[in-house]
Amino acid sequence: VEAQANATVYDGGVFIASCDKSMPAMLMSIGRLKDMSAIVVTGGVMEAHTLPKKYVVNDPACAINDLLTLEQIGKIDAWEKTSVIPNEQQDYYKLKACPSCGACAFLGTASTLQIMAEALGLMLPGTALMPATAPELKQAAYDAGVQVMKLVAEGIKAKDIVTMKSFENAIMVHAAISGSTNATMHLPAIAHEFGFEIDADTFDRMHRGAHYLLNIRPSGDWPAQYFYYAGGVPRVMEENKSMLHLDVMPVTGKTLGENLEALKKNGFYEREDIIHSFDNAKGTDGSIAILKGNLAPEGSVIKHTACPKNMFHATLRAKPFDSEEECISAVLNKQVQPGDAIFIRYDGPRGSGMPEMFYTGAALCADPKLASR
């Protein structure tokens, strides 16, 4: 992207991305191209699949409700290895877990970074996490093209939009949505390209006392496709505006405060099923914390909103493994018991590049005895 833009001497561009790696990469590219006008358009978020009643699993330890989303497939994969459910049922889940195009339908890295792009001011208001199949997405893309030409005409560059205040706003929105812990790596990298420095401790400091509002999986009940219809990023910012810099300028060319006021007047958001109000927050201490101690002297990150309260203080037996594959095998072979604390070594950013530990958690959830503890 950067090479193409520099080779053709663009005055402005519309940047399209959706997923875990492409969205932060696109935002980093904009940081390097900050002397041109830029708007980001999402490729959209995937739909959830509505399960027929016979495929709903009501076991509280390993529930699969009537809205199937991709993050549940790891659990189903572990069930397959232990023959918990019939093959025909497993095949059905796998076939239907991605029923449409778009980013995964839960608040993982992809959804979080789409929201961060809008919180930084680089998307048109309300367009992050639009459903990939929604007809409004085509209109949003067209509007972005029109707006970027206005930015070019007015001489408004990416560097005029993305400031240190923008990053502080994004971190406050991250707290409100219980965003992915991977943002603690991606946002500092994006900030660096724009000429600013933030670190994990910045997240920890700003999350303290922040209100957590979003009822979206994995820290809530609903698939990510409903976020847009509930008011999206503007609704989160409106509820949280007492903690934001309202004088920043997004790609609309107006201040954030002016944008929120305009949306509030037109009735863009109403109910609280998906996005809670500031006064009725799901929590009031942000959504992640940076933990330091003898296990991680330089720091580690936890999304405490997705962690059972009884695990905040616990005495457990250490069960270390040298790879995720070893760990999954031990879980499936009943070598991990309630009261064990799993440690997987050599899979951090300096080891194997910090891959997702997705299937380990899924294997634990697939064992009712472990999932209920």
Tell me what each language-model feature is.
Residues V1:
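N-terminal cofactor/phosphate-binding cores enriched in small/glycine residues
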Residues Q4-M26, A38-V41:
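A short, small-residue-rich loop immediately preceding and capping a beta-strand
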